[in-house]
């Protein structure tokens, strides 16, 4: 029986007449001894390929490295080693297309798109095809599939990756309910964040998030979390929970947006300065301190993960003025921890300091 030649789609321009299976074109060829395993369909004769991945969700941080575990084995075990093909890809979520991450045959591999230069297979031990992702980005969280292909036999497993982070509501300087879905995506990105998923909002509600303005989520639904039922928020008779308006038109309907930011690689700090500053002066002061003016998502992450606690209102990059409170302070607003907001004052006013961000 001829050996099976397996080549990624993008590497074989003349392959349109070949059978397509599991993201690859297959060709019966005896000419390439390096890519075949020499067994063909023998694997079907009483031997089962098993792929093992963890059932629990993996949690990590933006900028970190993480290993997505994946191992395979044969039942019953085989004496002679076999060369397999491995494919990792990120599953579709909320209408986004699937993303190829990496394909490998033996020691040869190829990564794709934004994953190039950031991913590789561990392969430290026999039958270990775990994927390492370096310099994690906000958009990397989600579900990944590990597929092992031996001839025409294939098995796969799922690994779910979640980033630890903080959800915060974001409102336009022009008031509530100003963003369509795409504008919500843009403003979250401008604040070092992404649009939050329902799971992230629900987890934030479990931790105490209470917000009465409805906002976009990643799946284009509009929802809001309520801990203390009250009249403007669905009425006092409803139980606490996450209220939903359901799916809304991505271009026509307008709401606020819930953003999600993860822990920082750098540091947010209140700049000690002899004078209060205008917004322009605040930006320049951070630059003079070898830093940049902090974004809203960075301030929330510093409050959540680094315990930033300061009762001084300061400018942020979007022109808002905020300050983070972890412990109650006299003359510092409500006793509950949170990031307080002064809204969007006149950029020329000299009433505030500034929060800066410096990368490590």
UniProtKB/Swiss-Prot annotation:
GO molecular function, one term: hyaluronic acid binding
InterPro entries: C-type_lectin-like/link_sf, CTDL_fold, Hyaluronan_bind_Proteoglycan, Ig-like_dom, Ig-like_dom_sf, Ig-like_fold, Ig_sub, Ig_V-set
Subcellular localization, as worded in the UniProt entry: Secreted, Extracellular space, Extracellular matrix
Record-linked Gene3D superfamilies: Immunoglobulins, Mannose-Binding Protein A, subunit A
Ig-like V-type domain mapped to chain residues: 48-164
Keyword Signal in record: yes
Protein name in the entry: Hyaluronan and proteoglycan link protein 3
């Amino acid at each position: 029986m001829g050996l099976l030649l397996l080549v990624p789609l993008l590497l074989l321009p003349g392959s349109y007449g070949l059978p397509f299976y599991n993201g690859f074109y297959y060709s019966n060829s005896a000419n390439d001894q390096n890519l075949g395993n020499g067994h063909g369909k023998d694997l079907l004769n009483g031997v089962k390929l098993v792929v093992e991945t963890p059932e629990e969700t993996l949690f990590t941080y933006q900028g970190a490295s993480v290993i997505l575990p994946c191992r395979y084995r044969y039942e019953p075990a085989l004496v002679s080693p076999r060369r397999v093909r491995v494919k990792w890809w990120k599953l579709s979520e909320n209408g986004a297309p699937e993303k190829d991450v990496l394909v490998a045959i033996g020691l040869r591999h190829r990564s794709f798109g934004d994953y190039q230069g950031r991913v590789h297979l561990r392969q430290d031990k026999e039958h270990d095809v775990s994927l390492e992702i370096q310099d994690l980005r906000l958009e990397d969280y989600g579900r990944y599939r590990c597929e092992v292909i031996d001839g025409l036999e294939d098995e796969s497993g799922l690994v779910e990756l979640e980033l630890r982070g903080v959800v915060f509501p974001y409102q336009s300087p022009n008031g509530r309910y100003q963003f369509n879905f795409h504008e919500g995506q843009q403003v979250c990105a401008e604040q070092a964040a992404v649009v939050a998923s329902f799971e992230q909002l629900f987890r934030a509600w479990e931790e105490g998030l209470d917000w009465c303005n409805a906002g976009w989520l990643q799946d284009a639904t509009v929802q809001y979390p309520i801990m203390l039922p009250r009249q403007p928020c669905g009425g006092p008779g409803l139980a606490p929970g996450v209220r939903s308006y359901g799916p809304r038109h991505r271009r026509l309907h307008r709401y606020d947006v819930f953003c999600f930011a993860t822990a920082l690689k750098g540091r947010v700090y209140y700049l000690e300065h002899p004078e209060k500053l205008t917004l322009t002066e605040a930006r320049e002061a951070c630059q003079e301190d070898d830093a940049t003016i902090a974004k809203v998502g960075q301030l929330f992450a510093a409050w959540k993960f680094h315990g930033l606690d300061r009762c001084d209102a300061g400018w942020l990059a979007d022109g808002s003025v905020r300050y983070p409170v972890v412990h109650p302070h006299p003359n510092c607003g409500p006793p509950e921890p949170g990031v307080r907001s002064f809204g969007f004052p006149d950029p020329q006013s000299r009433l505030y300091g500034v929060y800066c961000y410096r990368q490590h």
